[in-house]
Amino acid sequence: TLAFYSNAELDMLHIPAEDEARKAIRILNPISENLSIMRTLLTPSMLNVIVDNLKKGNAEGRLFEMAPVYLAKELPINEHPHERQTLCIGAFGPEEDFFTVKGALEALAAGFGLSFD
């Protein structure tokens, strides 16, 4: 997904004003207001992909994205932001629930020799 979104997407997720995710770097010349800040979370993008899939008639799916998020050390920025690799997993459909995502995380962790015990 794109590395940009808008403050409106953070508003829809009810991200508090004092949350680190609100310390987004504003793009000086954005393509549109919908792509005006650098992402601090992957959640808005994941939700948009799920909505797009549902609109296209896909009744179920399991998705993941591993991509950087950009965290400003301070605003306005005076140095390069911290880029943190982040994993986001989403699932939708009548058979999907918390345990679907939990199982995906456990399988991924096991692949790296990790556990949640």
Which functions belong to the PLM regions below?
Residues 1-117:
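Extended beta-strand-rich architecture
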